[in-house]
C-alpha cells in the first residue's frame, strides 16, 4: 500500500512544528528542571534570570492560572514542581525570552537547592513498601491451583524486559498563539489532540471550547507523543495566556531524552505447567511495571499486559497480576 504522504515527505514539503512561520513577537520557552530524582525544594531564587535582558517572564507553579495538574488517567502529575520534585528533569520554572539562547542562559541563572529524599526506582521495592501508583489488578481464568497436580512439567522463573526510548525523529514541542476573543491556538506534535486540549484547559483555567489544538505532522510518535505531549503544549499555552504573546518550545534531543517518559521496563515472576504432550495447562505470572514518577497511561498499559499475557495461546487456567 502506497503512502499518500510519501511524495511530500521525500521532497521536503511536509510541514512540521519547526516549519510553521513564526509570528512577530514570539517568545521562546525553556524550563529549569530538577537535578534530583526525589526531594523537597528548600530554596528557589529566580531573580537573576528574571532580570536578564531579553527575558520577559519566569513562571513558577504559583503563577499557574488554573490547576497545576496534567495527569490523564490519574491526577498525580503536576506540570511544575511546587514543593516536591518527583524525577530528574521535572520542570520547576518556565523562562520566556526573546530567543532560545537567552532562555537557556536564564535557566543557568536560577538558584535552586533541593533536599534529596530516598528514591525508589525498582517496582519490586515499591511493591514491598506499599508505594505503588495504583492498586494491583488481577486477571483470573479457570483454576490454576487444582491444575498443577495434573502437569507433567512445571517451570518457574523470572524474566526482565528493559525499557525503551521512543526516539522519534522530531522531538516534543508546541507553539501557542493568541486568538481574538481571548482564545488560544496550540500547534502540538501530539498523537492525542483532545488530551492536549484537556491539559491546556486545566492549566490555564480556560474552557475547552476556547482552545484549538492543531497537528500539522508528527515526526514519529510510537506512543511517546500521547499524553507525553501534554506538558509542552500546556507550558506554551500558559505563557501565551499570561503574556498575550505567541510562545514556542521545541525540545532539544537531550531535553527530550531526560525529561520525557519511556516505554516501561518490566520484571515478571512466572510459573507454567505442561502435560506430557507439552500442551500448556496452567500459567501464573506477576508483573512488576516500572511506571516512573507518575501514572500517565501506565494503568492502561498494565491492563493490556494482563489481557495479552497469554499471547496467541489458549491457556485454560491463568492467574495474571
Q: Where are the language model's segments positioned?
A:
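Short coil/turn connectors at secondary-structure junctions
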Residues: 25-28, 53-56, 82, 89-92, ...
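Glycine-rich and small/hydrophobic secondary-structure elements
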Residues: 76-102, 223-274
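Helix-loop-helix junctions that connect adjacent transmembrane helices in secondary transporters/permeases
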Residues: 124-204
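Flexible, low-hydrophobicity surface segments
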Residues: 1-135, 154-157, 242, 308
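Beta-strand segments within the central parallel beta-sheet cores of soluble alpha/beta enzyme folds
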Residues: 60-61, 210-216, 244-254, 281-286, ...
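Alpha-helical support elements that line or immediately flank enzyme active sites
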Residues: 31-59, 94-113, 174-216, 223-243, ...
